[in-house]
Amino acid sequence: MEDIKIKEIFENIYEVDLGDGLKRIATKSIVKGKKVYDEKIIKIGDEEYRIWNPNKSKLAAAIIKGLKVMPIKRDSKILYLGASAGTTPSHVADIADKGIVYAIEYAPRIMRELLDACAERENIIPILGDANKPQEYANIVEKVDVIYEDVAQPNQAEILIKNAKWFLKKGGYGMIAIKARSIDVTKDPKEIFKEQKEILEAGGFKIVDEVDIEPFEKDHVMFVGIWEGK
C-alpha cells in the first residue's frame, strides 16, 4: 500500500496514483464493503475508495479529461436525469454524502438494477419517471443545486431546460452529457454541439465549462452551465 498516492481534486473526489502511470479517480465510499458494479476498491486506513471507471461513467470521463467546474459538493441536492443502473449515481451519492440525489429512470427493467444500487445508499431517492415530464415527479423533488442529465434523446438540451424551470435554484448548475448521434446521425458532431450550446444559452444557462470526453465516449461533450433562468 506504500506506493498508493491519493489526492483530493474536488470535494470527495480523489486522484489515485497506483504507481503504474495511469490516471485514475475515485470517490470515498459511503457504504463500506459493497460494490455497485465491478469497480476496484482501495482501502487506506479506515476508508474505502471506489475507483471510478471513465468507460462506464461520462462524468468520470469528463473529470479525467480536465473538467474545471465541478458543482456537485458534499451538501448538494442533485436531480439526476437518466440514472440507468446506478453506476454514476452511486459515485455522485458518495460525493454528496451530506446531500441528496433524486435519481430519475424511465425504464422499469433498469429501475430494478437502480434499486439494487441504491439499496444501502440512503441519500439516493430512486424515482420511476419520464425526464420529459417533470410535473410527474414535482411532488417528490424539491429545489436542487445541480441537475445532471445523461438522457439519449434528440431533445436533450430542452429536457434540461424544462427541469431547470421546475427544480433548479437560480445560480444553480446544470451538467449535461450531449450525445451527438442521438440528435442527428447525418450532421457533423461539432455543429450539433454548437447548436445544443446555443439552445442551452437561449434557455437560461450560462455555459462555464465544456469537455470533449473522447476516447471514453465517441461524439460526446459535457457542458456545465449556471442557471440564470428565463
Curated annotation (Swiss-Prot):
EC code: 2.1.1.-
UniProt keywords, alphabetically: Methyltransferase, RNA-binding, rRNA processing, Transferase, tRNA processing
SUPFAM superfamilies in UniProt: S-adenosyl-L-methionine-dependent methyltransferases (SSF53335)
Lineage: Archaea, Methanobacteriati, Methanobacteriota, Methanomada group, Methanococci
Entry superkingdom: Archaea
Protein name per Swiss-Prot or TrEMBL: Fibrillarin-like rRNA/tRNA 2'-O-methyltransferase
NCBIfam families: PRK04266.1-2 (NF003276), PRK04266.1-3 (NF003277), PRK04266.1-5 (NF003279)
Residues binding S-adenosyl-L-methionine, per UniProt: T87, T88, E105, Y106, D130, A131, D150, V151, A152, Q153
Disulfides per UniProt: none
